[in-house]
A protein has these predicted regions:
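The conserved phosphate-sensing helix
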Residues: 283-296, 361
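Conserved Walker B catalytic segment
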Residues: 184-218, 363, 372-379
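Sensor-1/coupling segment of RecA-like P-loop NTPase cores
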Residues: 208-234
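Conserved adenine-nucleotide phosphate-binding loops and their immediately adjacent elements
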Residues: 47-83, 155-159
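Long, low-complexity intrinsically disordered regions enriched in small/polar
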Residues: 1-58
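C-terminal boundary/linker of central alpha/beta nucleotide-binding cores
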Residues: 111, 321, 325-408
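Post-nucleotide-binding-loop coupling segment downstream of the phosphate-binding loop, primarily
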Residues: 99, 104-184, 192-194
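Conserved small helical "lid"/interfacial subdomain of P-loop NTPases
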Residues: 244-275, 293, 318-329
């Protein structure tokens, strides 16, 4: 009965909402306009000799989720409406810069916004720049960007992937300077700060954009920056009449409640528990990354989550350290007598992922850890909600870079 209720709730959650509720999303690969159908954002990218489709698809699914694995999201209705209003206003400035500290929910907001728009008449280019999903190099990023733009302009890209990245970059810049075939084009680039062997600069977008072009870029605040000014300057967007900025704020108490409600049965019952919401807000301090981690953990508990009491949370410290203290405590309870044997291998795996400069393949982890294949698989099992990748087509990495700064220890 509970599984049937969960299924119905998730089906309902995938429908666009109006009013003061943020969209509730369980996600559905077969129903996502972003990655399936005749107008998905991967069309054109698959024409490259090296297919980067899986990398971008996995990035999108990380924030949309699937029916058995819904991804917490909510409390962002005002930001979604701001993006809608900017896009729908023909007199709005052509460029929009989205900035915030790490973990504030920029990627989730953009992916959910594009999914919610569902506007088949608006051609969309979406290319994330992500270390975790191996799209941060200039070879991958500019080839994918150029290929997607070429598809929308009805043209072909070169079949030779050996050409210099500058050629792909120049090709993309050329398309962005031309009027779109349908006089409308939305380009969304997430994660400019994660670029590895290149930098986003004043040559990335035209200073005189063609009619109908709208561009959204997202980036984390850099060192000694607390606002959008640094990125506006790097892109040359500080001049009047070219760009507006949007900075994401932490979630409010109401936003945390909305995230719980969006998950459907059984967590929606907790959204009305003022005491539980207050404790989750205290622990997360409104940080969307932490809210997602705690709500993910509650979802895994199923119906037992509804028996959660505020006393169960009051001994925990706010922030990621408090979360990991609870996470280790829960793991030791699950392992029981095997905890002394299981904990060292899990911690060794976490430490390797923390110190790695890029995602690690399975063979890399086996070599560096001196673990057997069985021991490594057992060590990765409890890390499923913290680590992305399969070790083969996509290396293992933390689902968010901030997790690595807290999980390592001696």
């Amino acid at each position: 009965m509970l599984e049937e209720e969960q299924r119905k709730s998730l089906d309902a959650a995938r429908q666009p909402m109006t009013g003061d509720r943020a969209i509730a999303v369980g996600g559905n690969v077969s129903g996502s306009i972003l990655i399936t159908g005749d107008h998905n954002v991967l069309e054109g990218i698959t024409s490259l000799p090296t297919d980067y489709k899986a990398r971008i698809c996995n990035f999108i699914l990380e924030y949309i989720g699937t029916p058995p694995r819904p991804v917490p999201f909510g409390g962002c209705q005002a930001d979604l409406q701001t993006l809608d209003g900017w896009l729908d206003d023909p007199a709005a400035l052509p460029y929009l810069l989205l900035t915030a500290p790490a973990g504030r929910g920029k990627s989730a907001l953009l992916v959910r916004w594009l999914e919610r728009r569902r506007d088949l008449a608006l051609p969309v280019v979406f290319v994330p720049i992500s270390l975790r999903f191996n799209t941060a190099s200039q070879t991958v990023f500019f080839a994918a960007l150029a290929a997607r733009l070429a598809h929308l302009f009805g043209e072909r890209v070169p079949a030779d992937m050996s050409q210099a990245p500058d050629l792909w970059r120049g090709m993309a810049s050329g398309y962005l300077s031309r009027p779109a075939p349908d006089r409308r084009l939305l380009v969304v680039l997430d994660g400019l700060d994660e670029a590895t062997d290149w930098q986003a600069g004043v040559d990335l977008f035209p200073f005189e954009p063609p009619p109908g072009l709208r561009v959204v870029v997202a980036a984390r605040h850099q060192a000694n920056e607390s606002g959008p000014e640094g990125w506006l300057r790097r892109l040359g967007w500080e001049r009047n009449g070219l760009a507006r900025s949007l900075t994401l704020a932490p979630l409010t108490h109401a936003g945390v409640s909305d995230v719980l409600r969006s998950m459907g049965v059984p967590l929606d019952a907790l959204s009305a528990r003022v005491d539980i919401v207050a404790e989750l807000y205290r622990l997360s301090e409104g940080d969307p990354l932490l809210v997602r981690l705690y709500v993910d953990d509650l979802w895994q508990k199923g119906a037992a989550a509804t028996r959660l009491q505020p006393e169960d949370l009051r001994t925990l410290q706010p922030g990621l350290h408090g979360y990991f203290d609870r996470w280790w405590e829960d793991q030791r309870k699950q392992w029981g007598r095997d905890a002394p044997l299981r904990e060292p291998t899990v911690q060794a795996t976490l430490n390797l992922l923390t110190t790695a400069l890029a995602p690690l393949g399975k063979d890399d982890l086996l070599h560096l850890s001196n673990l057997s294949t069985w021991d490594l698989e057992e060590a990765l099992r409890p890390l499923a909600r913290l680590v992305v990748g399969d070790g083969r087509t996509q290396g293992y990495a933390f689902s968010h870079p901030r997790l690595g700064s807290t999980s390592a220890r001696d």
